[in-house]
UniProtKB/Swiss-Prot annotation:
Protein name per the record: Potassium/proton antiporter CemA
Membrane association type: Multi-pass membrane protein
Main location group: plastid
A biological process term (GO) from this entry: potassium ion transport
A cellular component term, taken from the record's GO annotations: chloroplast inner membrane
Domain of life the protein comes from: Eukaryota
InterPro entries: CemA (IPR004282)
Name of the coding gene: cemA
Source organism of the structure: Pinus koraiensis
């Protein structure tokens, strides 16, 4: 059998070398692309966490002088009169009752009656100033929240690629865990958010949101939301766990229900 010509062996050797170098450069390129995507996604996640805190502070400082000037023109008071009139009247009645009770305990005289009128007048002026400041704060918070919500929504829409990468990381980390650890994490998250010991947290959150948007504290509405909303979330979550994990990992569903009991 004739030996293979040197030209063919040199050609094969050169082809192997080029293929190896191309594979190495391709691997390096893929690694650089992966590192870039990872760093971009982490920056995006950091911005997504920080924006809800930074946007309200920065916007409120810029909007509050404009809102104060707009409100003090006197043409806009009727907009929020319906929302705050009941609160203002309630405060005024309480102040008047306290002063009357205080003066009834003391000896009645003309000077005391005059002092009572002066003090009620001072408290009324303070009440009007408080009412004016409350309305300005409500409008500022409302505008800030609306602008911030629009900005964050646009940020989420424009960052679909980064969200997809972050979602893939979370899924990869979650599915790499054992079924027992998965069930533990799901149970921990559900108990913290919608468990039997979470109603007080829901009350604080709903009350804070209502005050931020200028709504008066209403115990009935808060109690109704606390007694129904977490139950609805719990039902939806259990249905999602059953539908999603019953096909992927039936043992996870069994472990979750066993730990939940």
């Amino acid at each position: 059998m004739d030996p293979i010509p040197h030209s063919i062996t040199r050609t094969l050797s050169r082809f192997r070398t080029e293929l190896t170098s191309e594979s190495g450069s391709l691997a390096i390129h893929e690694l650089e692309v992966a590192e870039y995507k990872a760093s971009a996604s982490l920056r995006y996640l950091a911005c997504l966490v920080g924006l809800p805190w930074v946007i309200p502070i920065s916007l409120r400082k810029g909007l509050e002088p404009w809102v104060t000037n707009w409100w003090n023109t006197g043409k806009s008071h009727q907009i929020f009169d319906y929302l705050q009139e009941e609160n203002a009247l309630g405060r005024f009645e309480k102040i008047e009752e306290l002063f009357l009770l205080e003066r009834m305990v003391e000896d009645s005289s003309g000077t005391h009656s005059q002092d009572l009128r002066i003090e009620i007048h001072k408290e009324t002026i303070q009440l009007v100033e408080m009412y004016n400041e409350d309305c300005i704060q409500i409008i500022s918070h409302l505008l800030t929240n609306l602008i911030g919500f629009a900005f964050i929504s646009a940020y989420l829409i424009l960052g679909k690629n980064q969200l997809a990468i972050i979602n893939s990381w979370i899924q990869e980390f979650f599915y790499s865990l054992s079924d027992t650890m998965k069930a533990f994490l799901i149970l921990l998250a559900t108990d913290l958010c919608i468990g039997f010991h979470s109603p007080h947290g829901w009350e604080l959150m709903i009350d804070s949101i209502s005050e931020n948007y200028g709504f008066a504290h209403n115990e009935r509405i808060i109690s109704g939301l606390v007694s129904t909303f977490p139950v609805i979330l719990d039902t939806i979550l259990k249905y999602w766990i059953f539908r999603r994990f019953n096909r992927i990992s039936p043992s996870l569903v069994v472990i979750y229900h066993s730990m939940n009991e």
